[in-house]
Amino acid sequence: MSTYPKTAALMKRGTDFLGCETAILCGAMSWVSERNLVAAISNAGGFGVIACGAMTPELLDTEIAATKALTTKPFGVNLITMHPALFDLIAVCRKHGVTHVVLAGGIPPKGSVEAIKADESGIKVICFAPTLALAKKLLRSGADALVIEGMEAGGHIGPVSTSVLAQEILPELAGEHLIFVAGGIGRGEAIASYLEMGAAGVQLGTRFACATESIAHPDFKKAFFRASAREAVASVQVDPRLPVIPVRALKNTGTEEFTAKQREVAALLDAGEVDMGEAQLQIEHFWAGALRRAVIEGDVENGSVMAGQSVGMVTKEEPAADIIAELMSQCEAALAR
């Protein structure tokens, strides 16, 4: 018998789909969601997800193998749809028998979902849906489950809040489809409310970034512990021509450097030195480098400290298993009221 019977009952569709004990996914955070944190979350009954980010197929191959050495539980891999080697990365996931692939960063390119599912691989595909119309389209295109992520989340974000997305999408789709809610979730009471609305589970990133098993630099973690919700701000788009997806991170010098980088890329566009695709790639490379500086090197002033608005609820370093247990007990208490 479950310690959290009410929560377990509402999460059952999600846990059956994921193959784990609690329908709590860890959001894929570049440089943070690697073998150690992913394995710790899966071993604790949650669902860890490797952030492939800008990894080459060779690096992803190594990371999946290293994760499998640390856990026998299921875990997923998050792939960025605009990655130039997307189909090679899919082949790596298939080779390793990864059970779930999460496609993030836009509409999956033609043939990508088919490539994941070819030869009856049994791999489940999870996609991000920022609107109801796109959610329906993704489900028609072969997505097995969706994550709806509000603007409170850290990293790349859309323009609509989690609570509004949940109200728009869950009543329409959650009866027949698996929908996971993400963005700004820091406590179990919030999980309870989304489960009661029909969500199959939830996804949290910020809450796990400072887990004991997270390899993030101690100074990166300290920045989280000091921060309040209002310090996790979204980046500003300088030039309307640049298709810059806003990024939520803690306000610092790096935030201003990103504004300057946009101006520099816009000037290159004006001069005809780069096309729109190259401009977007330069912006993404900026983020990848800035994030590494913060997470790995601990440069929290010039690097990008990507964090969701739930950062104010992250006050100490604790094991992933303790974080999951606390979320589950808070959720159960809320459902029992």
Predicted segments, located by residue:
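Acidic, glycine-rich active-site loops and adjacent beta-strand->loop/helix elements
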Residues: 151-152, 183-185
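Conserved active-site-proximal phosphate/metal-binding subdomains
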Residues: 159-178, 186-337
